[in-house]
């Protein structure tokens, strides 16, 4: 068909998931979820930095690996003595144990008490990237010299599990071997819950999020306030209370931990007005969008929503892909891109959850330093929004429309007689949504041209 202006008429508009959910969501909240951080001492990341630390800062004339062990031994002893003096349980993790499940009772008890505290210390043996040394071939009569390299070694680590009345649950993991790398974990939803309670905003919680809220706009404003400073203040507050391998003199000389992003989860939660609608919509959405991992779709999702006009190269180690994970009764749709992925699943049976999981900020053209968290979150939120705009909505997803439900489900007439349902897609049922009164909500399926009666 040709328009009167000579241009070809556009085909029928593609109905997206964003079109279908409009008008059927009672709460739409975007918030950082899990934030997993690396802590590193910048001045100890090179062999020259190691030599300078011991020789020039600590005054050791011969820099050798023998200097590492006394610091680690003292740190391990200080942690155990500190835990015993404060009545903090020390738990040794075994291989294959789920640490979160082991520590959950301790964190729940601390949350019930409502008091900030270290709830437990976990001990484990894990592979860490640490400094090792090899003796150089030098004059036997002269001073020994060593070459320092970083290698993966199985060493002891301490998990310090914390309940903070402002942040919620979290942990700090400290390696006991030089250069003492650190990991830290917090949850943005848990922080937002405590801020909402402090502000007097009523809400109903999901297992990790919000199911309802008295003031959605105020809740979203709280979620938007989660910043690098929020995490940095929490980290410094608890590091000041813990025994550490580095001293205050080391800190004054610039030897202290800086934080960078190891993994971030930026989520969007859409709570439906009816859990029946939520499940039906999600199941149909899965069937319609099994090709999201194709290069052309991944390009739309992860690259600013624009096609770049050149072939999209697959990431190293594998191509683009879509993967369906099933754990118990939870089904998750995963779309992979480089080291990151986009997840979509049904949260607690009532909400559609979308999460952009970034394992390398460079995938989104961001730097790793914690100060870049706002930029990374903005880009991840845009990806979450583009997912619903990219997903196509087929016939099954139209079940969220009350009009379609009335057509495709049996009803009772005014005389009490049962009227049979019309099968969705049947020629007789297609004109019905188009003939419905203007006040009724229309299904996206009704936007197509009605067939002849």
Regions from the PLM with identified roles:
Residues 1-263:
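Long, contiguous, compositionally biased segments that the model treats as domain-scale units
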Residues 85, 390-393, 410:
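Surface-exposed polar/charged interaction patches
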Residues 146-405:
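Extended, non-transmembrane interaction/recognition domains
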Residues 410-422:
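Short, Lys/Arg-enriched N-terminal segment that forms or immediately precedes the first helix
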Residues 422-425, 441:
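Amphipathic alpha-helical protein-protein interaction segments
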Residues 425-433, 448:
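Short, leucine-enriched amphipathic alpha-helices that occur as contiguous helical runs
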Residues 434-441:
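Short, locally clustered residues in the helix-turn-helix/winged-helix DNA-binding domain
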Residues 442-453:
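Short acidic, hydrophobic short linear motifs in intrinsically disordered regions
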């Amino acid at each position: 068909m040709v328009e009167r202006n000579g241009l070809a008429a556009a085909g029928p508009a593609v109905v997206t998931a964003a079109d279908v959910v409009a008008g059927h969501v009672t709460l739409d909240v975007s918030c950082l979820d899990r934030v997993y951080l690396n802590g590193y001492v910048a001045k100890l990341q090179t062999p020259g930095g190691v030599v300078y630390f011991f020789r020039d800062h600590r005054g050791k004339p011969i820099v050798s690996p023998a200097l590492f062990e006394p610091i680690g031994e003292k740190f391990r002893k200080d942690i155990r003595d500190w835990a015993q003096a404060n009545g903090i349980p020390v738990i040794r993790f075994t291989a294959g144990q789920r640490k979160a499940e082991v520590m959950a009772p301790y964190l729940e008890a601390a949350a019930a008490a409502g008091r900030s505290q270290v709830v437990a210390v976990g001990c484990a043996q894990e592979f860490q990237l640490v400094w090792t040394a090899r003796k150089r071939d030098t004059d036997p009569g002269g001073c020994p010299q060593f070459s320092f390299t970083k290698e993966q070694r199985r060493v002891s680590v301490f998990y310090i599990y914390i309940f903070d009345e402002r942040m919620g649950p979290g942990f700090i993991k400290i390696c006991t071997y030089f250069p003492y790398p650190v990991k830290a974990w917090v949850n943005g939803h848990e922080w937002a819950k405590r801020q909402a309670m402090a502000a007097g905003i009523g809400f109903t919680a999901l297992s990790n999020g919000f199911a309802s809220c008295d003031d959605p706009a105020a809740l979203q404003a709280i979620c938007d306030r989660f910043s690098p400073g929020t995490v940095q203040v929490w980290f410094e507050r608890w590091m000041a209370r813990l025994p550490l391998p580095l001293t205050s003199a080391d800190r004054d000389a610039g030897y202290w931990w800086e934080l960078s992003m190891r993994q971030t989860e930026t989520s969007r939660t859409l709570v439906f007005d009816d859990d029946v609608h939520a499940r039906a919509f999600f199941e149909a959405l899965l069937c319609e969008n099994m090709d999201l991992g194709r290069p052309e779709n991944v390009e739309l999702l992860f690259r600013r929503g624009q096609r770049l006009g050149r072939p999209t190269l697959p990431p190293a180690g594998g191509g683009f892909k879509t993967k369906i994970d099933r754990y118990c009764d939870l089904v998750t749709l995963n779309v992979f891109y480089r080291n990151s992925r986009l997840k979509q699943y049904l949260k607690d049976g009532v909400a559609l959850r979308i999460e952009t999981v970034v394992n390398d900020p460079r995938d989104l053209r961001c730097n790793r330093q914690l100060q870049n968290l706002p930029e990374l979150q903005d880009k991840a939120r845009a990806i979450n929004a583009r997912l619903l705009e990219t997903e196509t909505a087929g016939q099954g997803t139209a079940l969220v429309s009350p009009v379609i439900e009335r057509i495709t489900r049996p009803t009772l007439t005014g005389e009490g007689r049962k009227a049979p349902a019309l099968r969705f897609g049947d020629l007789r049922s297609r004109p019905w949504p188009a003939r419905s009164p203007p006040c009724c909500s229309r299904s996206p399926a009704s936007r197509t041209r009605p067939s002849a009666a």
